[in-house]
Amino acid sequence: GYLSDNYRQLIEADRYPACYRLIPALPKLLLHSWLSRLQTERFEQKTDKIMQLLGRHRKDWEHVFFIILARNFGFGTNSDAFEFWAETIPLQAVNKHRDSLFQIEAFFFGQAGLLQEVPADEYTDRLMKEYTYLSHKFGLRPSANSRWKLLRMRPDNFPHVRIAQLASFYYRSQGLLSALMEAQSLKSLRDMLRCGTSEYWLTHYVFGEASPPHPKTLSNQTIDLLVINTVIPFLYAYGKYKTDNILIQRANGLLEEMRPENNFIVRIWKECGLEAAHAGDSQALIQLKKNYCDIKKCLYCRIGYEYLKKPQCGGQ
C-alpha cells in the first residue's frame, strides 16, 4: 500500500530532506509545534552533556563552563581538541595567577603543547620558561600538539589565535559565570564575550612567524554562536539543576530573540519552505537533521509521520 511505498521512498531517498515535497502543504501550526519540541530536545541533550561533565568535575560549574566554551571556540574542526585541552587546564592553579595575562597564556599554550614548536622567538622563549616553572610548581603535563588541525583553515580560526582570545577573555572576566547568568540583556551578554588578544597576536597567527598587523577580535557572528551554543544552554542547564523555571524561560526567550544561524541546514530548509524565524528554530533544525534525518528516524518525526499518511506522496 501507499504507507509502505511512502516509507520506502523516505528511507531510500538520497536527497536531504527526503520529505521536501510535503513541507509547503503542512499547517504552520504543526511545523511550529514540532520545531518548539525540537528546540527543547536540543536543550535537554546539551544539559545531559553539561551534567556528565559536572559529575566528572565535582560540580565545578566554572570549570565545566570553561570546557564547553573552549569546545565551542573550536568551531567544529578543533572542537574535540579544545575540549580535551580544557579538561587538562588546572583552573584553580590558573586562578592564583589570574592577574597576569602572560602567565595565563603560559598555562594555556603550555598545556596545549604549542610551546614546543619551532621557529621560536623571544616571546615564545619567555612563555616556555614561564610554563616550565608553572608546570613544576603545579605538576602539569602538556597534551600532544598533534591533536590540533590547521589545514584548510582560515588563519583567524587557528588554535593559537583562539587560545590567545580565550586567555584574554579569562584574564578580564572574573566571576564570569555568575555575571553571564545575571546579564539582563542580549547586548550585555554579547559585550561580555567580546575579547581581543595580547599584543603579540596582533602580528602573529602562529608562534615565530610575523604577519601584517591585524586585530584578532571576535566577530559579531562568532559572539552570537558562542551565546547560542555556550551561554544559553548553560542558563537552561542551571535552571534545570536548580528547578528554576525563570532561568529556563530566560534561556528560551534569549534564543528566540536572536537571529537564526546562517548555515547550510537552515538554508536548505528555507528552500523547502520552512524558514527559521529565530535562533531557537535554527537550533531545532540542527537537532532535526542530526537526530532524525541523518539516522532515518522518519517514523519519529512529525513531518515524516505526515508524509507517510499522504496517499499522493508515494510514487511522485
Give the residues covered by each predicted segment:
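Short, well-ordered strand-loop elements centered on a beta-strand within folded domains, enriched
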Residues: 1, 79-84, 312-315
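A surface-exposed, charged beta-strand/loop segment in the N-terminal or early-internal portion
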Residues: 1-31, 316
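Intrinsically disordered, low-complexity regions enriched in small/polar residues
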Residues: 4, 172, 207-209, 294, ...
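Hydrophobic, aromatic-lined core segments that form the binding pocket/scaffold
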Residues: 39-282
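Acidic, carboxylate-rich catalytic segments that either coordinate divalent cations
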Residues: 271-315
